[in-house]
From Swiss-Prot:
GO cellular component, one term: mitochondrial matrix
Biological role: Plays an essential role in the assembly of succinate dehydrogenase (SDH), an enzyme complex (also referred to as respiratory complex II) that is a component of both the tricarboxylic acid (TCA) cycle and the mitochondrial electron transport chain, and which couples the oxidation of succinate to fumarate with the reduction of ubiquinone (coenzyme Q) to ubiquinol. Required for flavinylation (covalent attachment of FAD) of the flavoprotein subunit of the SDH catalytic dimer.
Native source organism of the sequence: Drosophila grimshawi
Name of protein: Succinate dehydrogenase assembly factor 2, mitochondrial
SUPFAM superfamilies listed in its UniProt record: YgfY-like
Family the UniProt entry places it in: Belongs to the SDHAF2 family.
GO BP: any one term: tricarboxylic acid cycle
UniProt cross-references to PANTHER family, sorted A to Z: PROTEIN EMI5 HOMOLOG, MITOCHONDRIAL (PTHR12469), SUCCINATE DEHYDROGENASE ASSEMBLY FACTOR 2, MITOCHONDRIAL (PTHR12469:SF2)
ATP-binding keyword on record: no
Subcellular location: Mitochondrion matrix
Amino acid sequence: MVRSLLPLSWRRCASDSSNSSTNDDIIVDYDGPDLPLPEYPNRPNEPLGMRKQRLLYQSRKRGMLENDLLLSTFAHKYLKDFDEDETAIYDELINGVSNDWDIYYWATGVKPTPPQYETDIMELLKQHVKNTEKVARFRQPELTYYL
């Protein structure tokens, strides 16, 4: 009995669904050059303290645990000492890149960093990722306020 139902289910799954009116069949190529990417809004009048608070939050909420841990510990350790230019470079790094996996692969050395992101801040992040102090990074650090 089961054997006789198997071809029927296979035909149903393999049948042409071109008559479907839903968008379930649309495949998006995320590496395609025609994919429109939203531009990150520039905030020219944002005070430095507020910018650091925003970056601290954004470093913690990346959408992938690997970057949550790496960037939150990095921001906790270094962001408070960044000047305005370094803060702007870090902002561009974590918000100018459209794919968080790229940041992870660059920081861990899996992929080469593009020239526009090869900065002192990226080098500092790469050193942080190497974790030469052998610091346990199983959870995000407590929130710190910079205002």
